[in-house]
């Protein structure tokens, strides 16, 4: 019932909410699409949203804001020049302007660089002339720098900086080794909504090169006020956020960053946040003591450090985006709170990690490091197929695959080298079939605390972010649990971890192998914190500040199991991403998750599956299921098919699967594949009689393959398509159980939390 003139504007603290904002800055919001992960996906844009996240950039000109946005989106670009477009002819560029896809803005930029007139571009794209003029200005600046031929004037340099060009970009384009001004630092302006007409209370800043530094003035005023009041000077800590939400690095890391800030503030520190994602709580103007809305790259961070002069920084809560800054922080001498940069590198570098395992006497799958196709083929021969292939320094299994044949190795090396900077090698590991487990631990440099061991329902080979995850682990022996706890402690001590560490294990035939170690927060930290009642980020930050786990009241070693089961089920957005194979693999594809909690495993699983959108149908008179599975999965699908048959389903299978099921006494009807003549599997899918599709194939990814087209067709028709044996088992067991959500008792998660 309040009127706008009765509500105070929180930003200024002086004007009321009916005061019209006056802005002296321009904001660009740029989408983050998942096409760097899904190389075969259709990149066409339309009325269906396909972005998984976004970045926001603020500048005192459109050009500067746009350059910041391109740097923030983490595509490995520092200007709007996209290398594939440089190789096209003018006619091909004009033809590509008609394509509405995620790369269109880069195509327009290339057209402007080539001198293609604005009228032609406008007629094709209908992009406003104002934007074309601004992008033309950027293109002219870039071309001007490229013509320097090793001689860069002060005026050219300052103009380029004003419009958003980074030092490394200017050096590369102008072909110079030294700049006219070394350490030319940006100033910071305040986001105040009133164009500096009133003094604002919000410590919310963006960088500019126009000579002003309102952040420095704000800091000096605050420090003078504190000194006048006799308050001690607080320790300043820089906290790096995780940038745009994308598959593999989502809102979980914002949870960690925000909880880190809250704990720092509660323990007498000034928490200064750096992030560029407008969707997050970390970029609310009142979360940290100060907020810098700028790209998370070394130069932007150096500018902030020059103004703030922090005492330390925290990199372990911002995902891989923040971890990539650790080495730079180490080089410039800014102390890192928690695990040191060298330990982070030791966990990521294959050779150093192998040496670490030798020292800890911990087994792992045999692996090799390769830089090109010849080395990859030789390594695959030496280790033996199948092999797990992935670039180093990735999160979310980006460009990660299991190669079953030499042809797979050749195809995937082509994909990886196209999308990943080959300064870092490709890692090949022997693929071990077994149960995958995951541990998040808190360490204080000596002792460690494991809130709980998580077990993945899907076996190794399916990315942990796409697997159904269960706490506490259901199928581990006490000896295996003891080994996991022992190995985690060895890693924590040997790496000198202070804060959080995530370790993934494969358990096969009673033997525990390590898959990877990440000395940082992981996407399971919010999940395990909530279901165990152990505030992991809070304890980790306190460890970073010098406290000991033994004094925090949660004990050390493995925390006692909760008296219920919590199941985390992934959620996918395949209906929005055309051309993406829905089959699970080592590359993460899920865009979210839900949680099911119940007194036992099956009830928790049922709640989780229903929450994730799985439908539980009662078979009608003509209801059927389709099976088309790879040879290695056929033995395990016999039992699944028999259970569905006993429920009343009619079974259909492609030739090989049908023959296998009939041979093992499960009646099944053959259906022609998608490339076969009608009536075929497509007609059956469109009949409306199919309740479930079970499809696993040895080959995937390529949208032209029958198996991929089948799974895509099922998604388009909203038919549940199960692509992993273990998920199929879980679903069928829930279908056959007589449990109902109405009969499952509620678990009040809020009762887990109690102050220690």
For each predicted feature, which ranges?
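Acyl-CoA thioester-binding alpha/beta core of soluble enzymes
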Residues: 143-146, 178-200, 205
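Extended, domain-scale alpha-helical bundle/helix-rich regions
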Residues: 160-163, 169, 173
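Compact, charge-rich alpha-helical regulatory domains located at protein termini
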Residues: 119, 158, 172, 666-668
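ATP-dependent carboxylate activation and anion-phosphoryl transfer catalytic cores
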Residues: 1-144, 148-155, 163-164, 221-223, ...
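ATP-binding N-terminal substructure of ATP-dependent carboxylate-amine bond-forming enzymes
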Residues: 69, 191-362, 371-378, 597-755
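Acidic/histidine-enriched active-site and ligand-binding environments that engage anionic O-linkages
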Residues: 378-388
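Short, basic interhelical loop/turn and adjoining N-cap
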Residues: 124-132, 172-182
């Amino acid at each position: 019932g309040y009127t706008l003139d009765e509500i105070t504007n929180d930003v200024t603290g002086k004007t009321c909410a009916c005061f019209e904002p006056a802005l002296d800055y321009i904001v660009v919001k740029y989408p983050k699409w998942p096409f760097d992960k899904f190389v075969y996906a259709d990149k066409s844009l339309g009325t269906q949203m396909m972005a998984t996240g976004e970045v926001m950039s603020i500048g005192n000109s459109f050009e500067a804001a746009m350059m910041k946005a391109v740097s923030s989106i983490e595509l490995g670009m520092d200007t709007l020049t996209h290398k594939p477009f440089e190789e096209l002819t003018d006619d091909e560029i004009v033809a590509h302007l008609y394509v509405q896809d995620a790369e269109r803005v880069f195509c327009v930029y290339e057209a402007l660089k080539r001198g293609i007139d604005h009228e032609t571009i406008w007629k094709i794209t209908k992009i406003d002339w104002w934007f074309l003029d601004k992008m033309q200005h950027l293109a002219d600046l870039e071309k001007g720098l490229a013509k320097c031929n090793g001689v860069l004037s002060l005026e050219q340099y300052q103009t380029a900086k004003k419009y958003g060009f980074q030092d490394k970009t200017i050096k590369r384009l102008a072909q110079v080794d030294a700049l006219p001004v070394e350490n030319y630092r940006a100033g910071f302006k305040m986001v105040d909504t009133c164009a500096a007409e009133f003094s604002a209370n919000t410590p919310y800043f963006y960088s500019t090169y126009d000579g002003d530094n309102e952040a420095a003035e704000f800091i000096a005023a605050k420090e003078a006020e504190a000194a006048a009041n006799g308050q001690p000077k607080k320790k300043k800590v820089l906290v790096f956020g995780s940038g745009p939400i994308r598959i593999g690095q989502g809102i979980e890391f914002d949870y960690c960053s925000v909880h880190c800030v809250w704990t720092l503030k509660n323990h007498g520190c000034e928490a200064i946040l750096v992030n560029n994602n407008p969707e997050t709580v970390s970029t609310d103007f009142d979360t940290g003591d100060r907020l810098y809305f700028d790209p998370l790259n070394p130069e932007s961070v150096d500018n902030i450090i020059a103004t703030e002069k922090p005492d330390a920084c925290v990199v372990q809560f911002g995902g891989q985006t923040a971890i990539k800054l650790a080495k730079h922080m180490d080089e410039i001498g800014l102390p890192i709170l928690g695990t040191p940069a060298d330990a982070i590198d030791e966990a990521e570098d294959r050779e150093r990690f192998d040496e670490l395992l030798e020292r800890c006497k911990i087994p792992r799958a045999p692996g090799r490091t390769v830089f090109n196709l010849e080395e990859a083929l030789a390594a695959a021969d030496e280790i033996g197929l199948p092999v797990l292939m992935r670039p180093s320094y990735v999160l979310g299994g980006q460009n990660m695959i299991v190669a079953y044949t030499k042809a797979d190795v050749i195809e995937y090396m082509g994909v990886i080298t196209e999308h990943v900077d080959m300064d870092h090698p490709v890692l090949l590991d022997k693929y071990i079939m077994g149960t995958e487990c995951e541990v998040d631990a808190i360490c204080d440099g000596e002792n460690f605390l494991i809130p709980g061991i998580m077990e993945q329902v899907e076996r190794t080979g399916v990315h942990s972010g796409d697997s159904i995850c269960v706490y506490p682990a259901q199928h581990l022996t006490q000896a295996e649990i003891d080994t996991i706890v022992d190995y985690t402690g060895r890693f924590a001590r040997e790496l000198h971890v202070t804060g959080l560490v995530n370790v993934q294990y494969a358990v096969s035939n009673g033997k525990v192998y390590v898959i990877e170690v990440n000395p940082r927060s992981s996407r399971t930290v919010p999940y395990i914190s909530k279901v165990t009642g152990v505030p992991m980020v809070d304890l980790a930050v306190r460890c970073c500040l010098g406290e000991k786990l033994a004094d925090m009241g949660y004990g050390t070693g493995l925390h006692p199991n909760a008296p219920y089961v919590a199941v985390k089920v992934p959620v996918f957005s395949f209906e929005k991403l055309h051309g993406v194979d829905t089959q699970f693999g080592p590359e993460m594809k899920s865009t979210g998750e839900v949680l099911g909690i119940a007194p036992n495993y099956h009830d928790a699983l049922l709640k989780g599956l229903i929450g994730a959108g799985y439908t539980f149908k009662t078979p009608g008179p003509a209801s059927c299921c389709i099976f088309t599975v790879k040879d290695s999965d056929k033995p395990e699908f016999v039992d699944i098919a028999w259970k569905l048959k006993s429920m009343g389903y009619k079974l259909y299978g492609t030739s090989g699967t049908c023959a296998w099921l009939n041979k093992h006494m499960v009646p099944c009807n053959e259906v022609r594949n998608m490339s076969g003549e009608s009536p075929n599997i497509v007609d059956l899918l469109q009949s409306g009689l199919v309740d479930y599709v079970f499809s696993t194939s040895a080959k995937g990814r390529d949208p032209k393959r029958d198996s991929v087209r089948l799974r895509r067709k099922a998604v388009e028709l909203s038919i549940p398509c199960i692509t992993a044996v273990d998920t199929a088992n879980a679903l069928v067991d829930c279908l056959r159980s007589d449990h109902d959500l109405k009969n499952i008792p509620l678990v009040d998660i809020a009762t887990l939390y109690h102050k220690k």
